[in-house]
Amino acid sequence: MDFSTLCIHGNIEKYDNTGAVSVPIFQSATFAHPGVGESTGFDYTRQQNPTREHLENVIKKLEDGVEAIAFATGMAAISAVMELFSPGDHIIAS
């Protein structure tokens, strides 16, 4: 798939319950589950939601990667990156 096509159609999903032809923006803070001990994969929006999951899947395909992680804030991203390094390590960033 061409790069520009992949940007638009990289992770096409059907939203049968809504009839949406593009990814809806899920703003729910919490999600209902079918029953006790049965999860839909989404519990709380700040942890994960269908909109962010879609974005991560598109970025993963665009970068030909294995995984992608989108953060809610820049500080969340910085904190996660800092956890990967040890005292005395050097980070070069621009």
Features from the language model and the residues they span:
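PLP-dependent aminotransferase-like
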Residues: 85-94
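Conserved N-terminal alpha-helix of the aminotransferase class I/II PLP-enzyme fold
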Residues: 30-79, 84
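Structural motif
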Residues: 24-25, 67-69, 89-90
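N-terminal glycine-rich, Lys/His-bearing helix-loop that initiates the first secondary-structure elements
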Residues: 1-42
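Short, electropositive, low-hydrophobicity segments enriched in small/polar residues
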Residues: 23, 78, 92
